[in-house]
Amino acid sequence: MAKVKRDISYLNKDFGDFRNQLINFSKTYFPTTYTDFSPASPGMMFMEQASYVGDVLSFYLDNQLQETFIQYARQTNNLFDLAYMFGYTPKVTSLATTQLDIFQIVPAKTIGTGSLPDFSYALDFPENTEVTGDGQTFTIQDNIDFTVSSSQDPTLITVAQVNGATPTYYLLNKKRNATSGDIQTTTFSFGEHQEFPTVDLQGTSIAQILDVFDSDGNEWYQVSALGQDSVYDKIKNTNVNDPNNSNGEEDTPYILQLKQVQRRFATRFIDNTTLQIQFGSGNAEANDEEIIPNPHNVGLGLPYTQDKLTTAYSPTNFIFTNTYGIAPSNTTLTVRYITGGGVASNVAANTLTNVDTTNTTFIQPTLNASLAQYVFNSVAVNNAGAATGGADGDSTEELRQNTISSYGTQLRNVTADDYLVRTLSMPSNFGSISKAHVQKPLNANSNTTLEIYTLSYDLN
């Protein structure tokens, strides 16, 4: 029997089109097999069921096609994927910042006919000391050493108590910037070596990863992409670290140092509550790196040599060794991360008054116990100004528009609009810009200067 060629239409999109096409198909190719096309007939029941399935699949196909375009996508996870594809990092929260005054008293000691503060009773606050108030937690990322005073970090001294005309106690005051958010800790265990392993960090309002250490004490560094093999590391500007520039340590207390790291990871938000951490593919026990380029093998044009003459260079990955870092194996990683922020973190002035002194210590270990306790109890903290910069994460439409704007700049700063986009794309751990405006200075003829005006959210 000869095979009959069927005329099939692929243009049907909804229930009615599918139903009519099935009826016409049956009448054309099975004219005597089935002739009852009334609504109550069994044959129409099967045709309408098939039309129903076709309509659902057609809708699903159209919807999924829309979800592949940033202009039309509506599902959060698809918008996040598209944002990363276009080079924009979604914001799920932004942290507020404020300046704090930290106080303590120290006893006076007699020097000749006068008196000076006894700095042996000065306190040392470690990094990431927490301050609370009005239901919010703020973190002081820098340590506080009251014995150190410089133009960049002055210790203000005033008389706190007197006996007649003689000071008995002095009040020490330091200022520090604080960022909203709670520090959370979690661990992930890894077994045998696996290329590009991923782990998911679950939580609400995840702002940033603070640090990652393995069970051997090695630090893992966050990079924007696993192909980036170097990071900028902040180190103190001392004579040991940089003899050539240490004479300017008061104006420049820290310097940036380019550091090549093999233990690294990249992060991306899957949705508003899930941060995925991905590691590299290398095995710490195997040498799988490419030979680092040097002047003897770059640009010779010979087989199996490096040719980097037409490559766009990045200062954080200028050797292009095609390595993606080490994958953790047979270890446990401890991850500290910050959660919180949002508009609610823009607390009013004079509300951050409680400081955690659990890890606070005296500079000198041997002191009078009762006097030391009195000094320790004198610790106080306050924010003279309101916290600003806290904002909720990107809404669906904000995420869409920010992604489209960010893609056009390609991370460059050339035009005024480029600077505007870079300003609005500030990492969330530094706060959030609500509105920004870029223009040339009104009273300057220079074409090389731009002024940036910014506004941030307050509590209301």
Positions of predicted regions on the chain:
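Signature of Asx- and small-polar-rich beta-strand/turn repeats characteristic
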Residues: 1-460
